[in-house]
């Protein structure tokens, strides 16, 4: 759920969800609604992905992160729907510009395609696509100082990535990467780098199951100002990443083993809030805890 940049006046918010389809298949959708008098009204879908599942794992790898940039454009991440990375890596749906599998898209706030999108007018390409070659981006944040767009995304067994997202860039999945096959441990990719494919700014090996990404801009943790905070589900950790000139120059594990971190956000009070996946606290359906981080004085 993301608020429109002018939410205070227009009361619009945006929700990504999986819209059911025929025969149990579904696709990622983004709905826009108006929140007034403690109720949602004027609910309408403004985007429905064309990201076919593989027929066996069709309920996974959806993507679904949404964010607005400074100009009011809406960005949406789409997962690869867990298509296997065989036999021809270059023909994987994440490399196909006629599907939304493994893509980032850029839209107007009403779902229209901006005329200056990088693939507008390109034959055999969906015009809303902004970037391609992703597996499953589960965190997205704009740098408030520069306007740069950053994402973290799941690798397979190993190889989670932090990427600087540029228009028309190809991030390589599954042709290049740092992960291996889940069951056999065999190599998946051609290598870690290839001409025409953008390498990650940072890699987690082993993977931590990245989820959630935000820039800290508050005053409560003054030493973190301008840094990225990234959550991990499998790794059950919160990480701090310091950037300089679009590169990661330092990293730190802030929290370890407090649960599967699904999302991390800075509150209006300047504290940091973590959404913990319910799976670690009990069976699905149990209350999902929200944790608040507050600074404490160091004890010498």
Where are these regions (language model features)?
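Acidic, Gly/Ser/Thr-rich repeat motifs that build Ca2+-stabilized beta-propeller blades
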Residues: 2-85, 139-142, 147-155, 206-251, ...
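A detector of repeated loop/turn-to-beta-strand junctions in beta-rich toroidal repeat architectures
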Residues: 27, 90-94, 101, 159, ...
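Blade-edge beta-strand/turn elements of extracellular beta-propeller
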Residues: 33-56, 95-139, 188-205, 243-257
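Conserved hydrophobic/aromatic pocket- or pore-lining residues that grip, position, or stack substrates
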Residues: 66, 104, 162
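Acidic/polar loop patches that form or flank catalytic/metal-binding clefts of enzymes
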Residues: 113-116, 149-152, 170-176
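Repeat-solenoid scaffold signature
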Residues: 125-166
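Mobile, glycine-enriched helix-loop/loop "lid" segments at the mouths of ligand-binding/catalytic clefts
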Residues: 165-193
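Repeated scaffold domains used in trafficking and secretory/extracellular systems
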Residues: 260-263
């Amino acid at each position: 759920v993301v608020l429109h940049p002018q939410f205070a006046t227009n009361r619009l918010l945006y929700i990504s969800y999986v819209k059911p389809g025929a025969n149990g298949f579904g696709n990622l959708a983004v709905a826009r609604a108006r929140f007034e008098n403690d109720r949602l009204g004027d609910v309408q879908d403004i985007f429905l992905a064309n990201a076919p599942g593989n027929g066996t794992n069709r309920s996974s790898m959806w993507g679904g992160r949404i964010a607005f940039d400074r100009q009011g454009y809406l960005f949406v991440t789409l997962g690869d729907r867990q298509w296997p990375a065989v036999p021809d890596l270059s023909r994987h749906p994440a490399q196909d510009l006629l599907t939304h599998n493994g893509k980032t898209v850029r839209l107007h706030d009403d779902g229209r395609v901006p005329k200056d999108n990088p693939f507008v007018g390109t034959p055999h390409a969906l015009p809303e696509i902004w970037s391609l070659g992703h597996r499953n981006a589960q965190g997205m944040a704009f740098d408030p100082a520069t306007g740069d767009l950053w994402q973290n995304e799941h690798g397979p067994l190993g190889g989670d990535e932090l990427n600087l997202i540029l228009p028309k860039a190809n991030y390589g999945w599954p042709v290049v990467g740092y992960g291996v096959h889940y069951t056999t441990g065999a190599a998946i990719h051609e290598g870690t780098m290839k001409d025409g494919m953008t390498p990650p700014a940072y890699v987690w090996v082993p993977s931590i199951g990245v989820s959630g990404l935000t820039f800290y801009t508050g005053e409560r943790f003054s030493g973190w100002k301008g840094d990225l905070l990234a959550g991990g589900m499998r790794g059950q950790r919160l990480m701090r990443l310091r950037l300089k000139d679009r590169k990661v120059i330092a990293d730190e594990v802030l929290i370890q083993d407090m649960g599967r971190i699904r999302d991390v956000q800075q509150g209006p009070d300047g504290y940091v809030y973590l959404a913990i996946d319910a799976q670690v606290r009990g069976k699905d359906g149990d209350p999902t805890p929200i944790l608040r981080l507050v600074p404490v004085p160091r004890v010498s």
